[in-house]
């Protein structure tokens, strides 16, 4: 029996959100393991960062090669590593500005709900957004590194706000990709990875903004 277009969209959305929820749960577990001292806290942050970057490429390669079992395992490992990577940041704000953590989490969830509702309840077409959002993201990353290395007089709050707008746009765009089924043969795992990165980055940006207010 042939599925209708709506059934296909819902199936892909449910699978994508399932992978996203699992990934976020594993990340929360990674944060807990670090804060609880189960994992050594003296491991350099850049080691987790390099491992995470390598895993992103590995997930994309294995998913595109249709090795879904390995890709799923790598996504789980990546999610835990990402939790260990962001754990020191979360731990700091839990001590210095605990309200900021809750506000950042609620804000991120709210943005995701709004993005999903707008994309799925309207006929909005975001096909042209991709290149501009990617360009804006690269610009934000370059400015961030330049500010860090050359100590440029750039407002960190303004930079955070700019990157926040970019990731809000990426969240809308990635939900549109799910609806339009554009991710290398409708791969729910890769779509979930994109939305996961949107979620984590938005959470960290909002955490920085709310933390400054406190």
Please report, for each region that a protein language model flagged, where it lies by residue.
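A hydrophobic alpha-helical transmembrane-helix feature that marks the membrane cores
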Residues: 1-214
């Amino acid at each position: 029996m042939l599925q209708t277009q709506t059934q296909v969209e819902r199936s892909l959305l449910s699978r994508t959100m399932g992978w996203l929820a699992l990934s976020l749960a594993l990340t929360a577990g990674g944060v807990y393991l670090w804060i609880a001292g189960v994992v050594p806290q003296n491991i350099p942050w850049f080691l987790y960062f390099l491992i995470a970057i390598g895993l992103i490429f590995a997930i994309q390669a294995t998913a595109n090669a249709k090795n879904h079992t390995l890709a799923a395992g790598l996504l789980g490992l990546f999610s835990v590593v990402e939790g260990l990577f962001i754990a020191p940041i979360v731990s700091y704000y839990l001590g210095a500005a605990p309200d900021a953590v809750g506000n950042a989490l609620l804000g991120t969830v709210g943005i995701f709900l709004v993005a999903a509702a707008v994309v799925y309840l309207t006929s909005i077409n975001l096909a042209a957004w991709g290149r501009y959002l990617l360009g804006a993201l690269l610009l934000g990353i370059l400015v961030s590194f330049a500010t860090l290395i050359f100590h440029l007089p750039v407002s960190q709050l303004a930079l955070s706000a700019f990157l926040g707008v970019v990731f809000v746009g990426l969240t809308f765009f990635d939900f549109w990709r799910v609806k339009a089924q554009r991710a290398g043969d409708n791969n729910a795992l890769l779509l979930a990875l994109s939305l996961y990165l949107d979620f984590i980055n938005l959470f960290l940006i909002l955490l920085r903004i709310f933390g400054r207010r406190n």
